Amino acid sequence: MAFLCAPGLTFFLTYSIFSAVLGMLQFGYNTGVINAPEKNIENFMKDVYKDRYGEDISEEFIQQLYSVAVSIFAIGGMLGGFSGGWMANRFGRKGGLLLNNVLGIAGACLMGFTKVSHSYEMLFLGRFIIGVNCGLNTSLVPMYISEIAPLNLRGGLGTVNQLAVTVGLLLSQVLGIEQILGTNEGWPILLGLAICPAILQLILLPVCPESPRYLLITKQWEEEARKALRRLRASGSVEEDIEEMRAEERAQQSESHISTMELICSPTLRPPLIIGIVMQLSQQFSGINAVFYYSTSLFMSSGLTEESAKFATIGIGAIMVVMTLVSIPLMDRTGRRTLHLYGLGGMFIFSIFITISFLIKEMIDWMSYLSVVATLGFVVFFAVGPGSIPWMITAELFSQGPRPSAMAIAVLVNWMANFVVGIGFPSMKTALENYTFLPFSVFLAIFWIFTYKKVPETKNKTFEEILALFRHNNGRSMLNCTNSLEPQSMNSGIEHAALMVSEEKTQHDSLFGTTSFSLTVEGMGPYPLSDSTNLLGPGSSSYGPGGVLGLAGSGSGLGGQCYTNYGTNLQTPQAARKCHYDEVDDYSFRRHSAHGRITQMKGKPLILGPTIKKDKKKERTDWLTASERFLEGGRSTHQGRSAASAPHHPRQPPPVCPSSGPXLRSASPPDSASVRSTSRAEEPHQPQQVHHQQQQVHHQQQHQSRYATHEYVHCSYEKEVVCDQANPSQAPPQQPAPPVQQHQQQPPPPLHHCQQRKHSHSPHHSRHTSPHSHHHHSHHSRHSRRSRRQGSGSLPGAHQGSANHSVMRPSICTSRRHRSVTDISTTNVCQDPACSDREVQEIMVRRTCCNTTATNSSSRTELAQCFAEDLYGSSRRPSSCCTSSDYCYQTDSTSLYGSRSSLSRNNSIKSASALVRKHHRSQRSLLPEHRHPSYTSISLRGLNASRPNSQLGSLTSIFDRAKNMAPEGSTLERQSSKGALGSSELPEYACSPSPIRWSFLADGRSPSEMEGAVGGGPEREQEEEDKLDAWQVPEPEPEKKPCRKITTSSSVYDEGPSTSAAAARKRRGSKGSRGSKGSGSYHCEFEDEATTTVMFHQDAGEAYNNCCSNNYNYIQCNTYLDQDLQITSEDIHQYLSKGDATASDILNNSKNYPFQPSNALEFQYKNNFQQGQANANNNNTNTTNTASSDAAECFQNYRAISKETNLNQTSTEQLSPTNINLSTSSNNINIVFSSSLERNANEVKFINNRSGASGGSEMGCEVGHHAGYLPYTYPSYDYTNMSGNSHFEKPLGIDELPKEFCGLEGAGGGGASTTSEHSSSLPSPQPLTHHQQLHHFESFDAASEHNLLAAQPMSPGSPLSGSVNPAGDDFVQMHHYHHANSPHSQSHHSHAHTHTHGHHVHHLLNHPAYDLTDDQFRLGSALKRVRKRARKYTDFLRKK
């Protein structure tokens, strides 16, 4: 009764389940109906045979005919069960059941008319057809019930399947007795009654809803899924179920259409498939079908009369029904695994009793009754466990994608075993006689052991949590995991900070694993930690000073100093951050790169070191001891397993320090800081004395290490690896010192210095930095002002407003948060040994990084093998996964799994990164200034092509469209998931589609005129030569001419690279003069010198839970864990075109791109990456040069003659202020509507107006980065099915401008020149006038009141937390509107960050150069047209 009153068990849910289980009742009825009339059917066959052939049939032949009648039912079941998966996907769960009833009616009619037709062949055919019907039922019904049942009732409702089977068995046995239909005249009616369940289901089932999971995940019909859930739950609040389904879809989207062969070959899905198969075999080979089919004859052979045997058979059916009812509440209370073990154990015992009763029945008369009791006990335990659990657990072990195929295979195996038992039991009974049940006893013992060892508990687990276990082990050996899937509660208080580590189980101890951390802070929710975070303080390492992860290479016995860290790099001391790998052998490298684990021990993070078999000890080091060791230079050594735990303030997070390990697996993408480092102001529990000691040590270290810096190497992303060597003018080259010596010379960086760099990238960061850090940073970075003025790299972290606040190149330390894009220009150019460089999350190792000696290709292949083993956790990984011509690197590609609730609970979130590859053809290409090619094409690499090719938005359809509309001469590439990683012969699991990985390829060109533009004399050239890749053969370089040294200025709040768009144009101008400092002609020469592959990897960090819980827009919440990674060519452009931008440019610092949630991605993106065309206006960097306008004009001319195509339109008409609307096909607002079957029904693309430059020498062409965007709003409602959203007002997110700008003419079209067009490379509009360029704005979200191009507060604990309000000071400080300034107006108007919003607007309106004309484009009217047309599309979708 408690189950009947359980929450969630509504009337309509009960009705739907009853209607569905009629199919299982059909299965039970036809299983037992052939048993009772056995003698009658045999007599009928004898009569037919005698009438045909005129002779009597032998007893052996009649037994064979009857066996065929019994077993052909199982043959049909095999066929139907195997077709169940296809039927479920093709017609749906409900649709398949309805169609299946046609077979049931046909089969029942054939059996019913068998005697009338005087043909036992019709009986065989009818049994076969009804077998197909029952096989489909056994596949579709459990699937349907498991998908409509709520989580808390799924086990009990799954048992209803077996209840219906037992009821069908009992009904067939009762009707088959001689007093009812068990006669010569009644048995055809008995068989024909199978038509009743089919007709009843045809009447009842149409009222029931389709499976919501099928509607939402498979068909992408969200509104229908919501309606079905509302009916089933009798409630309008179904968001929890919807979120669980979305989580399942996100976690398993790469397997959404997995075939049967893919299921069998998949290493991740093979273990649950084996479990499902064995569970089905445990049901059939337990011997239960022998009891069902031959119970009457079995009891008669035991000594019972025929009448008594029939009543005993009825008793078996009745006990089955009763025990199945009893097992329903036990299923969710005791658990599936436990009940199955009880059932198998009891059946084993009673099968022994049955065998004993057969042996001694002739000696003891009452032993015949013992056989009856033993048989009844056998049936009782079958009903408790193996009767219902195999059907249920098979559906639970698989997610939505592989579930149909898995159920088909399981049902096929079940029916095959059913057939074997049915056809073989008579012969086995004749051969074994009294030992008939002994083979079943052996099977029961085997199945019990397998269940105990291998089968997990699935009670109260979501489908994602169940599958997490198998993904966790990557399809290899499973341990006894009874409780491994239990939810792990994560306390929200910082005093109970815990780290979740998901380890890869490897086949030998030389393999590496992947880790993922999350820190749960009270009031903040899950907060992923970067792998570069040390929870234990500055002096403690994750494995102790000798562990590779904590202090890589500091232990004795290793030949090399620098080791690339794999796994958890909680804090990488100084020596560990050097990539000097030429003396370390592969074994040592792999041996010391093992896992680490961090567990929660009474609120203290306890760190368990790498597993070493011969050393099982655990050492715990106190915080202060670790700090002292840190200050002493980190010379302590430690071997074996070590740990460090540290008490800290209960309300403060432990101090963290970023690491520069070039090969980290992190919870954030490259150049991102996923953990907010605590500043000095936030550490009251830290003694001030420690700070001064650290500062003093750092100063000593800084001056001490100036001449030793060249000995160390930082491995960069790719062939952009730059040696960390001192300036040649300051130190002569030296030979590398011994590893231990190097480590002693280079103590780890102090805590506060790391903190300063962590906060030095954004204006928001600076307000968290203590004065001590500022002073020290100023003192530390006043050495290389010259390189900064030359623009020799984008160096975030500088304080440009003061002479003492310029940054030296070695101290670069960029930090970005999740979903930001990586700044290519700052890729690991840190020369300072104390610098934490950037947080590089790629895994990349070089043996001779910047070494002069060449390295053969075989060693690189070996390293590729190591990386492949680490990435996929298998020693069988071929090295071809990583090509020998490139560095072999990957990110954490462990699949995302877990529903949204489990992600919140377990924080089991994996991360990925943004990766960059460059194949340099010249030495100069290594320079940051040469990383801004003009890209001519972008193509999609389909690593996650889950949508069928026939659907709109699939990779095939988009690719075909791109080929048809691509300009002549453009490049389009498409690679398969295996070919993308270098081989088409790899096993499926080696380079299989990853659910967190989309990749884009971009073929680019670098302007030749940029060569030498950033020179600095012979010293600079010598430094560049030292940075040349050791594996590259230098090519003859063009003549290098010195260029003008540009000094830029900006606000005191600006922290970032000194190079700007204006400076870049000046350098180009000086280059155009061939070395002269005056302006000259600008040469628009483009030479194909570099090819760049840009790989964007989806990052799945803490922001999913945080942004959704803090009412941020749905798009970012949805796409954050959505495996269809939404990155357009616009984002790639932003990624690649910001090398010369300053740090306060929000696009380059911390913008979280609002990725477009659609697969309808454009490929062609023609020539949008202007050299050095970054956002100078954003930083108020107003430097002029007479060559600036020439440079911009040259680029405009180059772009004007280039062929540009919008793939979403057929017209190539250039955009102008007159056609920015939705009235024609040639517009720059792409609203892409696909069919209703498409997952993402529509999208709103970026709007970006290209404007030229004019104004002559009076006003330089200040090219704005991302200028000219029309404002748009990402809606907060469900974006995947617009017809399901009834509460929105502006459906496509096109919103008004702020009131101050709505009436401004020219505001929309008047953006300054931008480096990008529309994401699909729309043709450039005509250049606008000088007045039109004076004002442009960034994309402003009026609904959420923050700038979409700003840093979205993805985590409340980050320095960038809090929504940016355009009306407040924060918005003006970071996101004030920019406009071009003529020289005479610079003093009149200054973009100081202290301006308020109203003051800034007022000042803009009163700008002397601002003027309104009637013939200019009126943005307000355009927006009205946009919204009007958008609403029409939405209304159309609603009606559809």
Swiss-Prot record:
Annotated keywords: Glycoprotein, Membrane, Signal, Sugar transport, Transmembrane, Transmembrane helix, Transport
Annotated signal sequence range: 1-23
CDD domains, sorted: MFS_GLUT_Class1
Biased composition, class Low complexity, residue ranges: 686-704, 1313-1330
Keyword RNA-binding in record: no
Record's compositionally biased regions (Pro residues): 730-739
Topology, Cytoplasmic side: 24-67, 117-127, 184-186, 294-310, 361-372, 427-429, 556-1440
Residues exposed to the Extracellular side: 89-95, 149-162, 208-272, 332-339, 394-405, 451-534
Residues bearing attached sugar chains per UniProt: 460, 480
Compartmental location: Membrane
Sequence segments annotated as region (Disordered): 628-708, 725-808, 966-987, 1000-1083, 1304-1330, 1380-1401
TM spans (from-to): 68-88, 96-116, 128-148, 163-183, 187-207, 273-293, 311-331, 340-360, 373-393, 406-426, 430-450, 535-555
Record's compositionally biased regions (Basic residues): 754-789
Similarity annotation: Belongs to the major facilitator superfamily. Sugar transporter (TC 2.A.1.1) family. Glucose transporter subfamily.
Entry protein name: Glucose transporter type 1
Species of origin: Drosophila melanogaster (Fruit fly)
